[in-house]
Every structure is written in structure tokens, then in C-alpha cells.
A protein has these predicted regions:
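Mid-domain alpha/beta scaffold segments of enzyme catalytic cores
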Residues: 1-123
Length: 123
């Protein structure tokens, strides 16, 4: 397996269950040929911590965005906040986590209002 280099394109490393052992998590993925990871940002408050860990560990990159279940947090200034975050840090490699999620939520209008500007940034 050492000849194969893996990239995890969607992970969540700053959730509470990793807070105490992030360094151990890094050692485990390194030992399993995972060369890069992209943490999918769910809300704006995660961005400073994502920036910090991505600069601590060379393998970690991240996206900036707002998960559809957090769409109520979208504000008129949100698009410029995401744009600035993406432009300021070379470790940002995507916009998201974005989309529509009607499984747990009925805020369809809010989700669409948050989705469109994020898609514009990603384009």
C-alpha cells in the first residue's frame, strides 16, 4: 500500500472528538499513506481554527463555506468574508461545505440564499 498516495477530500478534524488527540490522528493518517486532507468547513466560526491547523500540519488544507443546515447564519457580508478568507490563505482550496440539505431541515429559501453566492465564489 505504500506506493499509493491517498487524499481525503472531505474530513472534519476540528470536531470535539478530535480535539484531544489531533496529533495522534495526524500520525495515524500519515502511517496509512494519506498525503493530503481537505477539511470541509461547516460554518464561519471554524475558519480561524482551520487556518491554524492547516499551517501546523503540511498535509491539511481546507475549504471555507457554510453548511446548508447553518444557512440561517448567512448575512449580506458573508460572501465577502468567504472571499477574503480564500484569498488570504493558500491553504484554502475550495468553497464549501455547500449544497442543499432538506433531510433534517425545512429552511429551503435560506439554503438557496446561502448556496447561490457560495457557488458564485467557487466559479
Amino acid at each position: 500500500m505504500s506506493d499509493i498516495e491517498l487524499i481525503d477530500s472531505h474530513c472534519h478534524l476540528i470536531f470535539d472528538n478530535f480535539e484531544e488527540d489531533l496529533e495522534d490522528v495526524v500520525l495515524r493518517f500519515r502511517s496509512r499513506s494519506v498525503k493530503k486532507l481537505v477539511h470541509a468547513c461547516c460554518e464561519f466560526s471554524e475558519i480561524p481554527k482551520l487556518k491554524k491547523i492547516s499551517h501546523e500540519f503540511d498535509e491539511i488544507y481546507y475549504s471555507v463555506g457554510l453548511h446548508p443546515l447553518e444557512a440561517k447564519k448567512w448575512e449580506p457580508s458573508s460572501k465577502s468574508t468567504l472571499r477574503r478568507s480564500a484569498q488570504e490563505d493558500r491553504r484554502v482550496v475550495a468553497i464549501g461545505e455547500l449544497g442543499l440539505d432538506f433531510f433534517k431541515s425545512e429552511n429551503k429559501t435560506q439554503q438557496i440564499e446561502a448556496l447561490i453566492p457560495q457557488m458564485e465564489l467557487a466559479y
